[in-house]
Swiss-Prot record:
Protein name listed in UniProt: Large ribosomal subunit protein bL27
Keywords: Ribonucleoprotein, Ribosomal protein
Similarity comment text for this entry: Belongs to the bacterial ribosomal protein bL27 family.
Highest classification ranks of the organism: Bacteria, Bacillati, Actinomycetota, Actinomycetes, Mycobacteriales
Organism (species): Mycobacterium marinum (strain ATCC BAA-535 / M)
Gene name of the encoded protein: rpmA
Any one GO BP annotation for this protein: translation
Location of the region described as Disordered in the Swiss-Prot/TrEMBL record: 1-21
HAMAP family: Ribosomal_bL27 (MF_00539)
Molecular function terms from GO: structural constituent of ribosome
One GO CC term on file: cytosolic large ribosomal subunit
Length: 88
């Protein structure tokens, strides 16, 4: 078999689709239960209060509330807290 394919042909031209990783809901945003908060590879962010972790390390809200980012024991965590109610 030839290792050189000949004129006007190329071995390049392949590219993979982006994985759409990253933070999907930011601090202070109000979310419902089940909403995806972060899509990640590995645990860049760790689950906190009312946050679950899927098999692919995706973090999701287990309850409705506001997103809160924080640090606990040197790890970045995400919590879901009661949204601040405004009395007006």
């Amino acid at each position: 078999m030839a290792h050189k394919k000949g004129a006007s042909s190329s071995r390049n031209g392949r590219d993979s689709a982006a994985q759409r990783l990253g933070v999907k809901r930011f601090g202070g945003q109000v979310v419902k239960a089940g909403e995806i908060l972060v899509r990640q590879r590995g645990t860049k962010f760790h689950p906190g209060v009312n946050v679950g972790r899927g098999g692919d390390d995706t973090l999701f809200a287990k309850a409705a509330g506001a997103v809160q980012f924080g640090i606990k024991r040197g790890r970045k965590t995400i919590n879901i807290v009661e949204p601040a109610t405004q009395d007006a």
